[in-house]
């Protein structure tokens, strides 16, 4: 039962082959048995899950139907969940229980999903390895000595290990797509504004976006259907009609124009990953796609721009965690200034403190023009590069990551090396574009992903290309040994 995809579960529930409660109990037992090896969950919500599963079964018995009715999943631990700990992977929010549900959580609950728990993550979503969590590093089920990627590493590891069929993630600079690539999943970052950010604890407000993580494009389509849509509570939510993502999965790729940027194949890319990218291009050509080279001339400036903008926004967003209203509070402060200083110094981990300091520096009076304003200009140039490329092609294809998963601890003391792992993913966030990573092979037994990017609100196109690719390849069906 645990091997089933979300789509297979939907069919099984509709045909009454099993109940949601039966499935939920099987998966909760599996999590209890296997997750100690992975550390993919921060909180388990067994009682809530059984209650939701029983309610879903009752709704189905009353004649209701729906692809997500009774489907089990987990939420990344930065989505507010009413009455349940929402820690953001940080000591700062270790005891915080949200007073309300995030829009993503409430929309999926209305569709009948069953919440098994909250998944581990890099602290405040800052990281590419899921090593900065207050609750310990998450291990990659493909090799327990390796990282699963981040910051949605808990969601990625749990789905890859077949602890559950799908999970929510968030993506600020690749935090859905990069862990999806490193754990053999399909992960989608929607267009900025496609999915509500209300109740999603912010890292960088102009870059953050929630999305689905699952084993197949078909499953991502089902989950995105339940997540997407306008939300008046989110000022950045865009009132754009939500198409039927599943309906477009089987569209032929004949004549589809795929662009491969020449700048993607630079010195930092593992040549074995480059080879797998070229092989995936050949498969898509066999399906009728037309492949041509395009250029993204400002790609080289993306990482410096991103690591000014994201920390700048983080320094502002995280200023609310001061030990006064909620979250961690130091003991016996001498005065208000001491309360602020010690609560933040003790509550935040080193990577979060590093980014807050970088961001505050970039926003300071003497450096705002030189750093923050300059980074925003580069952001506009990157966006223009994509607009020019999409005038010639329908989809852009390239590697998701420059390297496969690395050993836990290997890059902990070298932040720059870790930041460079985001080279291919951050541009979609800077431009607000939708991006998808899909399984494309293995290097030394570790999964590798290929990334697809499309124009605004063309998530359906990305899912269609990935689904067609998954009809002629079997990378996405492979499971890690022992899980």
Swiss-Prot record:
Organism superkingdom: Bacteria
Coiled-coil annotated spans: none
GO (cellular component) term, any one: glutamyl-tRNA(Gln) amidotransferase complex
Keyword field: ATP-binding, Ligase, Nucleotide-binding, Protein biosynthesis
Enzymatic reactions: L-glutamyl-tRNA(Gln) + L-glutamine + ATP + H2O = L-glutaminyl-tRNA(Gln) + L-glutamate + ADP + phosphate + H(+)
Enzyme Commission identifier(s): 6.3.5.7
Classification via PROSITE patterns: AMIDASES (PS00571)
GO biological process, one term: translation
Molecular-function GO terms, alphabetical: ATP binding; glutaminyl-tRNA synthase (glutamine-hydrolyzing) activity
The keyword ATP-binding is assigned to this record: yes
Active site positions, chain numbering: 76 (charge relay system), 151 (charge relay system), 175 (acyl-ester intermediate)
InterPro entries tied to this protein: Amidase (IPR000120), Amidase_CS (IPR020556), Amidase_dom (IPR023631), AS_sf (IPR036928), GatA (IPR004412)
Top-level EC class: ligase
UniProt family annotation: Belongs to the amidase family. GatA subfamily.
Annotated function: Allows the formation of correctly charged Gln-tRNA(Gln) through the transamidation of misacylated Glu-tRNA(Gln) in organisms which lack glutaminyl-tRNA synthetase. The reaction takes place in the presence of glutamine and ATP through an activated gamma-phospho-Glu-tRNA(Gln).
Name this polypeptide is given: Glutamyl-tRNA(Gln) amidotransferase subunit A
């Amino acid at each position: 039962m645990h091997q089933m995809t979300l789509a297979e579960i939907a069919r099984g529930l509709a045909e009454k082959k099993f109940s949601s409660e039966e499935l939920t109990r099987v998966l909760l037992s599996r999590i209890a048995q296997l997750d100690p090896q992975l550390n993919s969950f921060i909180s388990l919500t067994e009682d809530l899950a059984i209650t939701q599963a029983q309610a879903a079964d009752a709704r189905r018995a009353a004649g209701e139907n729906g692809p997500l009715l009774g489907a089990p999943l987990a939420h990344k631990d930065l989505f507010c969940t009413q009455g349940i700990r929402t820690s953001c992977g940080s000591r700062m929010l270790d005891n915080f229980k949200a007073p309300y549900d995030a829009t993503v959580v409430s929309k999926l609950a209305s569709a009948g999903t069953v919440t098994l728990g909250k998944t581990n993550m890099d602290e405040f979503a800052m990281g590419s390895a899921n090593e900065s969590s207050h609750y310990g590093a998450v291990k990659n089920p493909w090799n327990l000595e390796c990282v699963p990627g981040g910051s949605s590493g808990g969601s990625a590891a749990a789905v890859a290990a077949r602890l559950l069929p799908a999970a929510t993630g968030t993506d600020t600079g690749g935090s859905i797509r990069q862990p999806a690539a490193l754990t053999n999943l399909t992960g989608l970052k929607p267009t900025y504004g496609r999915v509500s950010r209300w109740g999603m604890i912010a890292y960088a407000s102009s870059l953050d976006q929630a999305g689905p993580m699952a084993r197949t494009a078909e499953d991502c389509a089902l989950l995105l259907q339940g997540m997407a849509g306008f939300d008046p509570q989110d000022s950045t939510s865009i009132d754009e009609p939500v198409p039927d993502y599943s309906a477009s999965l089987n569209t032929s790729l004949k004549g589809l124009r795929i662009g491969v940027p020449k700048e993607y194949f630079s010195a930092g890319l593992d040549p074995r990953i480059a080879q797998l990218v070229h092989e995936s291009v050949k498969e898509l050509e066999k399906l009728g796609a037309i492949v041509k080279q395009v250029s993204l001339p400002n790609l080289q400036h993306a990482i410096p721009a991103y690591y000014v903008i994201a920390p700048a926004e983080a320094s502002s967003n995280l200023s609310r965690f001061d030990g006064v209203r909620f979250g961690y509070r130091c003991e016996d402060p001498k005065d208000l200034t001491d309360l602020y200083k010690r609560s933040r110094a003790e509550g935040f981990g080193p990577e979060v403190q590093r980014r807050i300091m970088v961001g505050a520096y970039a926003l300071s009076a003497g450096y705002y023009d030189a750093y923050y304003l300059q980074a925003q200009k580069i952001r506009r140039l990157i966006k223009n590069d994509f607009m020019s490329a999409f005038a010639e092609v329908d989809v852009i294809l390239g590697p998701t990551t420059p390297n496969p998963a690395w050993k836990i601890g290997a890059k902990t003391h070298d932040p720059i090396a870790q930041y460079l792992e985001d080279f291919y993913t951050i541009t979609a966030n800077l431009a607000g574009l939708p991006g998808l990573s899909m399984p494309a092979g293995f290097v030394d037994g570790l999964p590798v992903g290929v990334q697809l990017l499309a124009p605004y609100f063309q998530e359906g196109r990305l899912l269609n290309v990935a689904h067609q690719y998954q009809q002629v390849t079997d990378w996405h069906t492979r499971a890690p040994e022992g899980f």
